[in-house]
């Protein structure tokens, strides 16, 4: 029989699902006492090369309030050609096409190995993909040139029938006509005035009939492909013209006097982009790709004035309620994000500048629509260029790794209710019998819209056990959950992916050990971290840390083995032993600690944490540290100051940064040039090994991490020193002068002190 670890891994590979608990407590009361909620990490479009989509539509339950999809958990009467829904127990007739089914001739959706299955919807017209570039022209010359080259390169990566459009902005906003005649025309809008969707569509001529003979018919925006085709054209038609147009783009002509910022109308440019797509291609897969090199400084959505002597808001300003533009700007971008999400479009933000660009205010545009957020120092860096190129990578079938306009519908058996979701989604406000009144994350619904997603996009979905304590579930009973994702594939097909899972119920009184053994501490850590980060958006930082600490203490009290008032007796079983250290590193992470990070950086880190899969999320919480030495092959070592030794090279992966750190002796040898001497060939190989491994990570990761190569005493060694557990500090005098690692100059508590304190509180009867 497979161990729980193997079971968890198999389910993740097959269904893209990781649950916090893999055996479920059978009553509401007991579930609340488990501390960590029953929840899962769902990767709706996890890549499955072994799962070709079936070319027919799913069979649905006939009950209007259910509409669950036929799945391997349903009871089937092959003689009568009936099936019973495992969620509402409705008996349903099979459609005529299923007339030949039997125990030995089952359709794929009834086979246990197809707990996840994908259907291709044949009906309905297919729509092309749409890419609308919104480009800031208030950039330095070399930055603008690099961005233009990246955009020109991207045209060659788009499908030939994809529609593409261009909006540029500085003090004014220009919507470019993309005709094939080679004449450059554009509509110019003032950057200080907000316009309604109707005004934008009227000004661009999107609501007028395309030809005089159509005057008699009332005009509908999406009825006039001619009108929209002036601004959105197939790549194969305007490839050359658009390449030339991009090449001719100039810096914003408005002069910028000394001591002033350029006037940048980002808010109006985005508003026009949203209005253009809203009027021409609602409910069609589209990406608005915003490229900005500085903060919005005028019009709706401005986050700072044009006076350089007045800096952009900091965390200190926000805490003192001294960020005068923040609330109004955030409201503007939230309104745009909600309109974009309602139309099934997504917004990407590519912000490259040395100072902040307003990501804090604009974050909802990417967070609510499933768009990408990329932050860098300049468009003229490999970090931006390679990250941007990676957006257009293709899968094993030659299709883009992106999907559009998805809706996620969650169905549960009657003992469960849905509390909410945390991830790149918005609520569709679909109430129903399986929706809980207690909200965790975005709740009050059983359906969410995810306008942009890729094979790693992951949502945290939280549930509530509602079965009462006095109505026991029969022995061997199983709870079931179905995830139904409707989406537009990058090949423009409409598809439906259905994942149906079941887990055993267990009585906590008699089967607590089973429930304990089925605890997935990695998934639980990420799910609790998502809750913490979600709370951090609206609560004070110390309050969130206190909440996380309380949950950890309660969990240790519930599942630890100990004698009252005796911290030395405290033990956690293997399935819980790593959880406290995940929480220790989470408390120190940039998701919850804003010290030393700008508001934009915090928004960027939190954006990625809310959408990455389990493996990447764990790296973000607790970075991975590898050691390279002459003593053997590279090996993972503790993320601890004791691992920083003079004769070692360390490679640290934090997801956002890849840090190579040379120990003191290694750094001296490199300085002396030993690697260039033939007799020290092995030293040359030692120096090269972490570089090769770092390159491998850099090639695979999206967004591309920042690459830092440093050494003992180097200024950038701080990236490593700030992440490791400070087990040796300037206060541990006994460690000085010994080969026990590097002392860290910090007042932060170490993991050992944290654990000692946790044990003390867990065994205390006062808690």
Swiss-Prot record:
Gelsolin-like repeat placement: 634-720
Molecular function, one GO term: zinc ion binding
Modified residues annotated as N6-acetyllysine in this record: 564
Gene Ontology CC: COPII vesicle coat; cytosol; endomembrane system; endoplasmic reticulum; endoplasmic reticulum exit site; endoplasmic reticulum membrane; perinuclear region of cytoplasm
GO biological processes: COPII-coated vesicle cargo loading; intracellular protein transport
Chain positions found as N-acetylalanine: 2
Matches recorded under InterPro entries: ADF-H/Gelsolin-like_dom_sf, Gelsolin-like_dom, Gelsolin-like_dom_sf, Sec23, Sec23/24_helical_dom, Sec23/24_helical_dom_sf, Sec23/24_trunk_dom, Sec23_24_beta_S
Domain of life: Eukaryota
Tissue: Ubiquitously expressed.
Swiss-Prot/TrEMBL keywords: Acetylation, Congenital dyserythropoietic anemia, Cytoplasm, Cytoplasmic vesicle, Disease variant, Endoplasmic reticulum, ER-Golgi transport, Hereditary hemolytic anemia, Membrane, Metal-binding, Protein transport, Transport, Zinc
List of residues binding Zn(2+): 61, 66, 85, 88
Gene3D superfamilies assigned: beta-sandwich domain of Sec23/24, Sec23/Sec24 helical domain, Severin, von Willebrand factor, type A domain, Zn-finger domain of Sec23/24
Assembly information from the UniProt record: COPII is composed of at least five proteins: the Sec23/24 complex, the Sec13/31 complex and Sar1. Interacts with SAR1A.
Similarity comment text for this entry: Belongs to the SEC23/SEC24 family. SEC23 subfamily.
Protein role: Component of the coat protein complex II (COPII) which promotes the formation of transport vesicles from the endoplasmic reticulum (ER). The coat has two main functions, the physical deformation of the endoplasmic reticulum membrane into vesicles and the selection of cargo molecules for their transport to the Golgi complex.
Name of protein: Protein transport protein Sec23B
Gene behind this protein: SEC23B
């Amino acid at each position: 029989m497979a161990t729980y670890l193997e079971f968890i891994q198999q389910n993740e590979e097959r269904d893209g699902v990781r649950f916090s608990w893999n055996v479920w407590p059978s009553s509401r009361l007991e579930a609340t006492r488990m501390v960590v909620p029953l929840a899962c990490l769902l990767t709706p479009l996890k890549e499955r090369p072994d799962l070709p989509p079936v070319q027919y539509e799913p069979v649905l339950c006939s009950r209007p309030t259910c509409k669950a999809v036929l799945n391997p958990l349903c009871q089937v009467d092959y003689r009568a050609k009936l099936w019973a829904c495992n969620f509402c127990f409705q008996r349903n007739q099979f459609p005529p096409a299923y007339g030949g089914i039997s125990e030995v001739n089952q359709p794929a959706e009834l086979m246990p190995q197809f707990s996840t299955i994908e259907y291709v919807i044949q009906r309905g017209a297919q729509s092309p993909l749409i890419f609308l570039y919104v480009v800031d022209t208030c950039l330095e010359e070399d930055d603008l040139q690099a961005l233009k080259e990246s955009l020109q390169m991207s045209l060659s990566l788009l499908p030939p029938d994809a529609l593409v459009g261009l909006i540029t902005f500085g003090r004014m906003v220009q919507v470019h006509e993309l005709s094939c005649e080679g004449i450059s025309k554009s509509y110019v809008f003032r950057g200080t005035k907000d316009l309604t969707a109707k005004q934008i569509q009227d000004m661009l001529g999107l609501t007028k009939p395309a030809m005089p003979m159509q005057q008699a018919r009332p005009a509908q925006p999406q009825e006039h492909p001619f009108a929209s085709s002036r601004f959105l054209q197939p790549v194969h038609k305007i490839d050359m013209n658009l390449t030339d147009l991009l090449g001719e783009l100039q810096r914003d002509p408005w002069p910028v006097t000394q001591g002033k910022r350029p006037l940048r109308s980002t808010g109006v440019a985005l508003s026009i982009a949203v209005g253009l797509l809203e009027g021409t291609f609602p409910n069609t897969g589209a990406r608005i790709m915003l490229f900005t090199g500085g903060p919005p400084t005028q019009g709706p959505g401005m986050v700072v004035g044009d006076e350089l002597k007045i800096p952009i808001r900091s965390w200190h300003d926000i805490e003192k309620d001294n960020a005068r533009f923040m609330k109004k700007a955030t409201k503007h971008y939230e309104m745009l994000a909600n309109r974009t999400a309602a139309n099934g479009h997504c917004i990407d933000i590519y912000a490259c500048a040395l100072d902040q660009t307003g990501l804090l205010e604009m974050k909802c545009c990417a967070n609510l629509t499933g768009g990408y957020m990329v932050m860098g120092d300049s468009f003229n860096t490999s970090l931006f260029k390679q990250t941007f190129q990676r957006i257009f990578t293709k899968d094993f079938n030659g299709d883009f790794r992106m999907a559009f306009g998805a809706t996620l519908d969650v169905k549960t058996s009657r003992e469960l209710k849905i509390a909410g979701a945390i991830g790149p989604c918005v609520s569709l406000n679909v109430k129903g019998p399986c929706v809980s009144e207690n909200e965790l994350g975005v709740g009050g619904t059983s359906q969410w819209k995810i306008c942009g997603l890729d094979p790693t996009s992951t949502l945290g979905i939280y549930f509530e056990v509602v079965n009462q304590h006095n109505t026991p579930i029969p022995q061997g009973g199983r709870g079931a959950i179905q995830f139904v994702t409707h989406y537009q594939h990058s090949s423009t097909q409409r598809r439906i992916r259905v994942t149906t899972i079941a887990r055993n119920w267990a009585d906590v009184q008699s089967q607590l050990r089973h429930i304990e053994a089925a605890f997935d501490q990695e998934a639980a850590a990420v799910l609790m971290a998502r809750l913490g980060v979600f709370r951090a958006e609206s609560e004070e930082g110390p309050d969130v840390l206190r909440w996380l600490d309380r949950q950890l203490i309660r969990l240790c009290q519930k599942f630890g083995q100990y004698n009252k008032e005796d911290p030395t007796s405290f033990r956690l079983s293997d399935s819980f032993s790593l959880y406290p250290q995940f929480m220790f590193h989470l408390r120190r992470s940039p998701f919850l600690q804003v010290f030393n990070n700008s508001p934009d950086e915090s928004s960027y880190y939190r954006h990625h944490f809310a959408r990455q899969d389990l493996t990447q999320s764990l790296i973000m919480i607790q970075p991975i540290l590898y050691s390279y030495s002459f003593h053997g092959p590279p090996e993972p070592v503790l993320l601890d100051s004791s691992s920083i030794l003079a004769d070692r090279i360390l490679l640290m992966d934090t997801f956002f940064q890849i840090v190579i750190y040379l120990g003191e002796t290694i750094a001296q040898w490199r300085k002396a040039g030993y690697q260039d001497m033939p007799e020290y060939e092995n030293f040359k190989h030692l120096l090269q090994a972490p570089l090769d491994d770092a390159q491998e990570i850099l090639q695979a990761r999206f967004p591309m991490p920042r690459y830092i190569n440093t050494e003992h005493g180097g200024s950038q060694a701080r990236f490593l020193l700030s992440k490791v557990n400070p087990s040796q500090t300037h206060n541990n005098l006994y460690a000085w002068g010994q080969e026990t690692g590097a002392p860290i100059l910090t007042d932060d508590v170490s993991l050992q002190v944290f654990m000692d304190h946790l044990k003390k509180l867990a065994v205390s009867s006062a808690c």
